UniProtKB/Swiss-Prot annotation:
Keywords: Cobalamin biosynthesis, Glycosyltransferase, Transferase. It comes from Allorhizobium ampelinum (strain ATCC BAA-846 / DSM 112012 / S4) (Agrobacterium vitis (strain S4)). The gene is cobT. GO terms for biological process: cobalamin biosynthetic process. SUPFAM superfamilies: Nicotinate mononucleotide:5,6-dimethylbenzimidazole phosphoribosyltransferase (CobT). This is Nicotinate-nucleotide--dimethylbenzimidazole phosphoribosyltransferase.
Length: 340
């Protein structure tokens, strides 16, 4: 326990001492990969993914209990008319998820993925970030802790997504605070903002970052001031997964912004994470580049709700299955290039 006892203190301690990869599991996976019936490197990124799974799960690559976790939150900044949809759509989409009617439901069925939906005080939008912090430190820390519970039921691959009207505005503000540049660099159409609405969105992001500019050197302060409940919850889930050695797939622009806050706090904080896809939101590729990551997919999607991460989970499952299920040269009676 720290001397101050402030709500963020426990998270600061966790972020300072993150567990690393399992070197023995990685060595074992590399040894097996060299024996499989294929030329070295011929499966490309599938081989890299298998090694990543081994290193961060501490065992032979396997995906037996994949889970998509979607966090939903509402934002006070939406009152500025920055999106074509009202905030009530967040609750309506949560109900659609529960009824099995959304795109993510179909992708989860297709790839045999579990799905959990977490609605985060939807009747109580966060503060309007142009004039006040989104959350108090206590509320932000509590929401991070709630997000950590995403893994409570057990999973060996966590896919993170979100739902929240106005949250691409939030993501743009976070990226501007972390990386600089102009608001125009980070603001895109989101759910369809165009023309004057897009100009309002840009102005709101500028105003928010300017209002909080004296408090943006600390990533956790950026989170509570410019973020939202789904941002805090996803950050908590990523952190919990790291502590429990669970590999993570991050979805789109908003989920990437949540992840970026952790990397800003500790450069190694996302080593157990891959980016599922690059979305069509203009700032997403720039944000991914800032993290030093390469997305698994580029399908022109910009839906959110974990869809890109869920699709990428199919690739990760295939990587694990290839590594564990393929025969070795000896088992198959196939001559290895290095043995004749």
């Amino acid at each position: 326990m720290s001397v101050t006892g402030l709500p963020f203190d426990d998270f600061r301690v966790l972020l300072r001492d993150l567990p690393g990869p399992d070197s023995q599991a990685l060595v074992a996976a590399r040894d097996r990969d060299r024996q499989l019936t294929k030329p070295p490197g011929s499966l490309g990124r599938l081989e890299e993914i298998a090694m990543w799974l081994a290193a961060w799960s501490g065992r032979a690559p396997a995906v037996n209990r994949p889970l998509v976790a979607i966090f939903a939150g509402n934002h006070g900044v939406a009152r500025h008319g920055i999106t074509p949809f009202p905030s009530s759509v967040t609750q309506q989409m949560v109900e659609n998820f529960a009824a099995g009617g959304a795109a993510i439901n179909q992708i989860c069925v297709a790839h045999d993925l579990g799905l959990k939906i977490f609605d985060l005080a939807l009747d109580y939008p966060t503060g309007d970030i142009t004039v006040e912090p989104a959350l108090s430190e206590r509320d932000c820390a509590a929401t991070m802790a709630f997000g950590m519970e995403a893994i409570a039921g057990g999973t060996d691959l966590l896919c993170l997504g979100e739902m929240g009207i106005g949250n691409t505005t939030i993501a743009a503000a976070i990226n501007l605070a972390l990386y600089g540049g102009s608001a125009e660099d980070w603001v895109g159409p989101g759910t369809g903002s165009q023309g004057e609405m897009l100009e309002r969105k840009i102005a709101v992001v500028k105003q928010a970052v300017e209002f909080h500019r004296d408090h943006l050197s600390d990533p956790l302060e950026v989170m509570r001031r410019l973020g939202g409940r789904e941002i805090a919850a996803m950050a908590g889930a990523i952190l919990a997964a790291r502590m429990e050695r669970i590999p993570v797939l991050i979805d789109g622009y908003v989920a990437t912004a949540a992840a970026a806050l952790l990397k800003a706090a500790n450069p190694s904080a996302l080593d157990h994470c891959l980016i599922g896809h690059v979305s069509a939101e203009p700032g997403h590729l720039k944000a991914i580049d800032k993290l030093g990551k390469t997305p698994l997919l580029a399908l022109g999607m910009r839906l959110g709700e974990g869809t890109g991460a869920a699709l990428a989970a199919g690739i990760v499952k295939a990587a694990a299955a290839s590594h564990t299920g393929m025969a070795t040269f000896e088992q198959a009676g196939v001559t290895n290039a290095g043995t004749h």
